[in-house]
Regions:
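Active-site beta3 strand of CheY-like receiver
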Residues: 45-50
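Active-site residues of response regulator receiver
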Residues: 8, 52, 80
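Short amphipathic alpha-helix used as the core "switch/output" element in two-component signaling
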Residues: 39, 61-72, 90
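Charged docking surfaces used in two-component/phosphorelay signaling
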Residues: 15-23
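Acidic catalytic/metal-coordinating carboxylates
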Residues: 32-36, 59-62
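The feature encodes the CheY-like receiver
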Residues: 14, 56, 84
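Short hydrophobic/Thr-rich beta-strand motif most characteristic of the beta2 strand and flanking loop
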Residues: 25-32, 40
Length: 122
């Protein structure tokens, strides 16, 4: 299992996702906005970061750039309800591991996280 940071300004989604991933055996930390996520990245390493694209303060692309700089092996999965193809392409070019449209099922996210953790080990 892995150490995961969830950054999302929608409390219910963030807490529900954290609960599901904790029950699946992951160690989970939460950030309610992009600035808090960047602060957590400065404090330590995560195997996977799940970040909302649109948040107050720094956005998901800022979180992605910070993760790439501080922890190049950390997989970042961006989540959004309002994304476009151009945004997805930009995120992948910057180094996102994956890009997920909301709403999604927890099982879908668990598979993506496991794949990200496996890829880190190769």
């Amino acid at each position: 299992m892995g150490r995961i940071l969830i950054a999302d300004d929608h409390d219910a989604l963030r807490r529900g996702l954290a609960r599901g991933l904790t029950e699946a055996g992951h160690e989970v930390d939460e950030a309610s906005n992009g600035n808090a996520a960047i602060e957590r990245l400065h404090e330590g390493h995560f195997d996977v970061v799940l970040s909302d694209l649109k948040m107050g303060g720094s956005d998901g692309l800022d979180v992605l750039r910070t993760a790439r700089t501080l922890h190049p092996t950390t997989a970042v999965i961006l989540m959004t309800a309002f994304g476009t193809v151009n945004t997805a392409v930009e995120a992948m070019k910057i180094g996102a591991f994956d890009y997920v449209q909301k709403p999604f099922e927890i099982e879908e996210m668990e598979v993506k996280i496991e794949k990200a953790i496996e890829m880190r080990r190769i």
